[in-house]
Amino acid sequence: MSLTTDIKDELARVSVTRQSAKAAEVSALLRFAGEMQAIAGRLVIEVNLDSMAVARRLQEFISQLYDTDVQVHTVTPGGARKNPKYLVRIVHNADEVARRAGLVTRSGHLIRGLSPQVISGTISEAEAAWRGAFLAGGSLTDPGRSSALEVVCPCQEAALALVGCARRIGVTAKTKDSRGSERVVVRDAEAIGALLTRIGAQKSRIVWEEKRLSREVRTPANRLANFDDANLRRSARAAVAAAARVERAMKILGDDVPEHLAEAGQLRVQHRQASLEELGRLADPQMTKDAVAGRIRRLLTTADKRARDLGIPDTTVAVTEELLDEL
């Protein structure tokens, strides 16, 4: 199974005792995966889900909260779709469910984001809303350069509401328009881990963290072995050469190295094959790759000028053929 499937299976088993948290989860599930339509003069709510466990959970919660019958149907695969879908259908008292779940106002007007009760609710309700949104349209990719936790949203208002809920539980999330749909994205690895724990997917977090740590350990050893691309090899040579020059610069300047330049230089020396972007992420506080490059450049320029004044070899003497041949 995929990591996303594992997370949804785990979330579908999360025990929720507070009625307000159940209501927040249901509200998000209906908003992010549901559709309201009039059939034969009656309002009907339909929710399309990719997990039977999630469909049964939604059925149970709605029955408990609103004392109404809920139907669950299996939609067999067809066309380009290889896996079955599960349709949760609310016909009886659908208008009452829509109002109490915060899909519409008391006067029947559509609420495009999340309900005010969820937005201004407790921390546990914000967590429950995120759990519902992820069960409705969430995904998590394996750790890597482009790893991200994403939730597909029905509209911009819903996306902004979800970002607000993330902020309330201490997680930074951003909205983006991708492939014609609104999405909420969490990219920072620590934030992804914290969010998984918050919504109840602790076991999945451990699996994801183990994969991430394994990749971080394996990547430096494999990096040069996989350098079939000439551009990557050139980048590695340039990074190693820069590290050698930085070491020479530190010796030339001694205690006269400005602290902010020394910090950038130490990052370059300690992580010889890392890209400038990676060095920026390792800095505390984090910097852009341009800021890192600028500081290293000023460090080398300052050291080369000092070397000329002292009549000694500058930083370029540290870059030898033997050093580059090792790559």
UniProtKB/Swiss-Prot annotation:
Gene3D superfamilies: Homing endonucleases
Keyword set, alphabetical order: Cell cycle, Cell division, DNA-binding
DNA-binding region extent: 275-308
GO biological process entries: cell division; regulation of sporulation
UniProt family annotation: Belongs to the WhiA family.
Function: Involved in cell division and chromosome segregation.
This protein's name: Probable cell division protein WhiA
Source species taxonomy: Bacteria, Bacillati, Actinomycetota, Actinomycetes, Mycobacteriales
